[in-house]
């Protein structure tokens, strides 16, 4: 039973799920808005909000911590220097999820996730 389980498995192994969230986070940082499945978006929100809170500090250690999760220099630099400073006075809630439509092939719910 999955009572009080802390995260969604998304039908993937742990390494595949970790890679998926990393790639979605990089795409969100690069484009500021992406469309994906609703449950992937909800998991990504948790992942990216923790990174943004860390990046708000803006020092070298924050840069290292974010890079350890993303493994992408450009995305790390953009998050720490451009995106996170905008939320210096905001305590959480850096992203917005909006349900958009249903995917034509399998009728799953799609959503856009974007920085507020």
Swiss-Prot record:
Q: What GO biological process terms are annotated to this protein in UniProt? A: translation
Which keywords does this chain's UniProt record carry? Answer: Ribonucleoprotein, Ribosomal protein
Among SUPFAM superfamilies, the record links this protein to:
Prokaryotic ribosomal protein L17 (SSF64263)
Molecular function via GO = structural constituent of ribosome
Q: Which Pfam families match?
A: Ribosomal_L17 (PF01196)
Which InterPro entries does this UniProt record tie to the protein?
Ribosomal_bL17, Ribosomal_bL17_CS, Ribosomal_bL17_sf
Cellular component (GO) terms are: cytosolic large ribosomal subunit
In which family does this protein belong, per the annotation? Belongs to the bacterial ribosomal protein bL17 family.
Q: How does it assemble?
A: Part of the 50S ribosomal subunit. Contacts protein L32.
Q: Which HAMAP family match?
A: Ribosomal_bL17 (MF_01368)
Which protein are we looking at?
A: Large ribosomal subunit protein bL17
Lineage start: Bacteria, Pseudomonadati, Campylobacterota, Epsilonproteobacteria, Campylobacterales
Q: Which gene encodes it?
A: rplQ
């Amino acid at each position: 039973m999955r009572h009080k389980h802390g995260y969604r498995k998304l039908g993937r192994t742990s390494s595949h799920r970790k890679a998926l969230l990393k790639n979605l986070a990089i795409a969100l940082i690069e484009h500021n808005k992406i469309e994906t499945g609703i449950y992937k978006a909800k998991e990504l929100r948790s992942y990216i909000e923790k990174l943004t809170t860390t990046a708000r500090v803006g020092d070298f250690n924050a840069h290292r911590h974010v890079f350890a999760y993303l493994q992408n220099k450009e995305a790390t630099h953009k998050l720490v220097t451009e995106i996170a400073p905008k939320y210096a006075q905001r305590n959480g809630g850096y992203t917005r999820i909006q349900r958009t439509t249903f995917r034509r092939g399998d009728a799953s719910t799609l959503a856009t996730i974007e920085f507020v």
